[in-house]
Amino acid sequence: MFSSLYPLARASLFKMDAEDAHHLTLRMLGAAGRTGLACALSPRVPDAPRTVMGLSFRNPVGLAAGLDKDGAAIDGFAALGFGFIEVGTVTPRAQPGNPRPRLFRLPEADAIINRMGFNNSGVDQFVKNVQAARYRGVLGLNIGKNADTPIERAADDYLYCLERVYPFASYVTINISSPNTKNLRQLQGAGELDALLAALKDKQRRLADLHGKLVPLALKIAPDLDDEQVKEIAATLLRHDIEGVIATNTTLSREAVKGLPHADEAGGLSGRPVFDASNAVIRKLRAELGDAVPIIGVGGIFSGEDARAKLAAGAALVQLYTGFIYRGPALVAECVKAIARG
């Protein structure tokens, strides 16, 4: 029923300010998840099991981080048929993010520009929300650094968050690719990334001993990388035995949206315009990584065929964000069914 009603709901939501609509949707999904209403109204999504990073996924179509930064609507999103849920990005301390307005729709391009800036309630509240959720499927927890933490001390924030979220995560995503936190993408540089992953891997081993379980780490990277940068990142992932990589985050490019309203707004562009760039990075990663490190493909998925294209490029799993906002819950089932057909 959600699927059939969504076009009407979207028409109303798209008349609202984009961020206000986002918060309203989160509140509604949070309430629906708590009451069980979401399950009653949700589309039937077939199982299409996958095992990736040593984890068992009900199906290979997940929710990308960013839609639920505080983990406040996990049960509501889970009821929509996603095979896994990723929430965050969370930082050690609560922060407001960048000034509003900071979220813009580009409906002519099926795109969104955001410069949210890791707005979140902090890792302590985040963990409380995660613990309160009833969902027991695969849950990814996405971590970042506070805006006022010097880039030279970024590892401290990631290590702190990793320790706090580790007991509650199926996997942990290291987000170093948001364009909306000053200098964050510097951490994708060879030396910076090597040092960060070495520290995180050491922390992961110690936490695994403490908690009696190894929680996989996944690195989320940008689409705005040249071939040499992708090769360096792949080599660093292999060197440190990182369990997964998510490709990709939003792009700074505006080539595909030139002349459209809001196209010149600062921030990361997501949606259809990032589809090809994301697929190109996935193909390059697969060529460098082989089967050693699984790839989660995200960026511009608006149909089942788009999801299949991500897998054909080399992804093992996919995630939805902007396509989900434009298409609604029906997109989840469509993608799962298309992938299951092979």
Curated annotation (Swiss-Prot):
It is a peripheral membrane protein. Pathway: Pyrimidine metabolism; UMP biosynthesis via de novo pathway; orotate from (S)-dihydroorotate (quinone route): step 1/1. It comes from the Bacteria. It catalyses: (S)-dihydroorotate + a quinone = orotate + a quinol. It holds the Pfam family DHO_dh. Its cofactor is FMN. Keywords: Cell membrane, Flavoprotein, FMN, Membrane, Oxidoreductase, Pyrimidine biosynthesis. The keyword Aminoacyl-tRNA synthetase does not apply. This is Dihydroorotate dehydrogenase (quinone). The lineage of its organism: Bacteria, Pseudomonadati, Pseudomonadota, Betaproteobacteria, Burkholderiales. The gene is pyrD.
